Amino acid sequence: MGIAVEARKVYPYPFQHVVTSYLNKYPTPLEKHVLSVKTVEEKTDPATGVVYRKRIATCNNVIPSFLRRCSILKVSNVYLEEESWLDMKTRVMTLETHCLTWAQYATMKEESVYKECTENSNWTEFTQKGTITITGAGFLNRVLETFAQTFLSHGVKKSISIMETILRERCGCPFS
């Protein structure tokens, strides 16, 4: 069946500030569940100037303990892989993220875009679409999808709030 979560936010800060803040966002005391983010690959396309990055995030397992009775869910950490393409010429950064930990049981995809806002070049537009489909947990599939939808919806709001806080701390009052 699967679930989907979507978000949109306009940050009243220039693209460069938002992208730099995003790439340096974690770890932060504002989000205790993200333990680390490690860049495992980075290269620049000499023809286009597009910077490609692959990063691995290590996060606490936040699945409730009553669901962790299922052996496949009994892990301390969850690993996410994020790939990003930063094009400073067009002022667009595209990201694709998926879960490595439960890849054989679930498909978790998140696609995000940061781009210069068409309304105001000093602003940055953020859009995100995420989907989760759980197939390998039998009767728990729907229960886990419902939990995932609630968790992801909350997580998107929290992530946006963290970005707003970091941008205010690093860049001061937003541009209008």
From Swiss-Prot:
GO terms for cellular component: mitochondrial intermembrane space. Residues 1-175 form the PRELI/MSF1 domain. PROSITE patterns: PRELI_MSF1. It holds the Pfam family PRELI. This is PRELI domain-containing protein 2. It comes from Xenopus tropicalis (Western clawed frog).
